[in-house]
Amino acid sequence: HSETAELVMLLQEEIVFEEYYRCYCIGGKYVRIMPYEPRNPFHLRYVADFSPSQEKLKEMQEIVLRINKYLGYDFNTVELALRDGVPYAIDFCNPAPDADINSVGQENFDWVVETAATYMIEKAQANQPGRDNLTWGEYIKRSSAGAERLMP
């Protein structure tokens, strides 16, 4: 607290984890789950040998999709730490996440570029002129619905 002064911070329990994953989510439907080791030097963070089961991958994908649907982010990363097999969302508000080829690696970079292009084409094709074509998350929808009730 003494170092952040007036900055808004999210206080979280420290999760001493066995596995850690960084998950891209694009368009609220495309998810890439990447083993990630945040304790490694920067250039080696995507060099992690975690191997989740298909069931755990599905659970993590559902968590990532749920968070992004609620926030309404078109592009985000969610970091999940697994402790005793339970995924904890650690960092999940990254609407402009790092996708630099030098940090995420060629394979992950290629996925981001291809998937973002696919999503942008879908959005362009679905565009309805004169209408609100933005992605509004459940958080904003619910908040604005409550604000409407307060208006005279």
Annotated model-derived regions:
Residues V78-L80:
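Hydrophobic residue at the +6 position relative to the catalytic HRD Asp in the kinase catalytic loop
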Residues H1-L71:
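Phosphate-binding site of ATP-dependent enzymes
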Residues R32, N76, Y88-D91:
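Protein kinase-like catalytic core scaffold
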